[in-house]
Regions:
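Short, Lys/Arg-enriched N-terminal segments with co-localized hydrophobic residues
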Residues: 1-6
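N-terminal loops that bind phosphate or other acidic moieties
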Residues: 7-400
């Protein structure tokens, strides 16, 4: 079923398609997303609570493991996660809202696949992840870069402070690419996806997305991004307000919000989330930009929310607002400002080791009963303590007058 869909999506991505057809396919995929299987983890949870008292004593770790099992089931072999970095430039960078020049996006993409010396590479190696990099809209030539998906919908979005960031067809194309990638990765056996992004000025786009969908003022969603100055922060806030006033995105239409104020890499991450939900994969969000993409994904496909986990709360002002709208509790508070699947790598490592430990607890019935017996021996006394008139003699005799 997924193989047929992947072939169709591949054809669509290489042909000029009518926007209505693209939207019909996205809608069909969303309709096929199933609720997570709570029964798949229920029996596991009951046994775990028996073996590791008190009930739910493992806290967030237990919740992480149960969410994964309800999505993917108990794995015969747990594959490593996929660290997927989506790259694109943003036309709004012309408004001077970032501390870095736009060509930084190309330089970082080159670093990912040539010298492999970025934080994204280091954390992917740490979690033993499969690393993928995609050019959705870098304003520069990446044809000679190895190990990169050359998608390039356009060399950067348009300046959303002046006009819509992209056409609706371009927005749908970015979504479909992400959907296709999630389906393809599931066919290869991967079930934990860690989206990251690189795109100078993309926190400006994310601030506009969060303000639009969460229905809050831009003051609450606009942060310092790459640690910009107070003066530039005020400029950035004014630009976010201008983006929203110019384009008037419809908060109920995720594709419209993406079209008006989004980015190609954010659309691809939103698509990855929808495709993961369709394919029963877990997506662990990283920072604010991935949360903004999740807002788009869940506006288009509300049932995809059950397939998302929030790794951490970062340093951007809009991050907690986006997570609250998504109904997600972050696992950690890290104040990370990089968006290269760093926080999500740490969460994935915690999940994978937690899952392995929980499976190990249940591995042997002999060990299980021995453990329960030991706990009962410690916690249940053979008889209650008997108090006599001698019980407090030591204390009364040694007390100072």
């Amino acid at each position: 079923k997924n193989e047929d869909k992947m072939m169709n999506l591949t054809e669509l991505l290489h042909e000029k398609q009518n926007i209505d057809k693209l939207e019909d396919i996205i809608q069909q995929i969303c309709q096929e997303v199933e609720p997570v299987n709570q029964e798949a983890s229920k029996d596991f949870a009951e046994k775990l609570d028996t073996l590791v008292p008190p009930q739910q004593g493992l806290g967030k770790l237990r919740h992480m493991v149960m969410q994964y099992l309800s999505i993917a089931g108990i794995p015969a072999k747990l594959m490593p996660p996929v660290n997927f970095i989506f790259c694109s430039d943003h036309g709004v960078s012309a408004e001077n809202v970032s501390a870095y020049p736009p060509e930084t996006t190309l330089h970082m993409a080159t670093n990912y696949v040539i010298s492999k010396g970025a934080a994204a590479n280091a954390f992917s190696n740490f979690v033993q992840g499969k690393m993928k990099v995609a050019d959705l809209g870098i304003n520069g030539n990446t044809d000679n870069l190895p190990d990169i998906d050359h998608v390039k919908i356009r060399p950067g979005t348009r300046n959303a402070a002046q006009e819509p960031a992209m056409t609706r067809q371009e927005a749908a194309t970015s979504l479909l690419y992400g959907i296709q990638q999630a389906m393809e990765l599931k066919e290869q056996g991967y079930t934990i996806l860690l989206p990251g992004e690189m795109g100078i000025s993309n926190t400006t786009s994310s601030a506009a997305i969060a303000a639009a969908i969460c229905q809050v003022s831009p003051e609450k969603t606009t942060g310092r991004g790459t640690n910009i100055s107070d003066q530039r922060l005020q400029k950035k806030l004014a630009v976010v307000k201008q983006m929203l006033a110019t384009n008037q995105p419809d908060a109920t239409d995720g594709l419209d919000v993406l079209t008006k104020v989004g980015g190609y890499e954010l659309g691809a991450i939103a698509g990855l989330i929808i495709g993961a939900a369709h394919s029963h994969c877990l997506v662990i969000l990283d920072g604010f930009n991935t949360a903004a993409a999740a807002l788009i994904a869940t506006t288009i496909c509300p049932q995809a929310r059950e397939y998302i986990m929030a790794s951490h709360i970062g340093g951007e002002a809009g991050h907690p607002i986006a997570l609250q709208k998504l109904g997600l509790q972050p696992i950690m508070k890290l104040d990370i400002k990089l968006g290269e699947a760093i926080g999500s790598s740490l969460a994935a490592d915690l999940l994978i080791n937690g899952l392995a430990a929980c499976l190990n607890v249940l591995k042997s019935d002999v060990e299980k009963f021995a453990y329960v017996d030991r706990v009962q021996d410690i916690m249940i006394q053979p008889k209650s303590v008997q108090l006599t008139d001698k019980t407090f003699d030591f204390y009364t005799k040694t007390m100072p007058p």
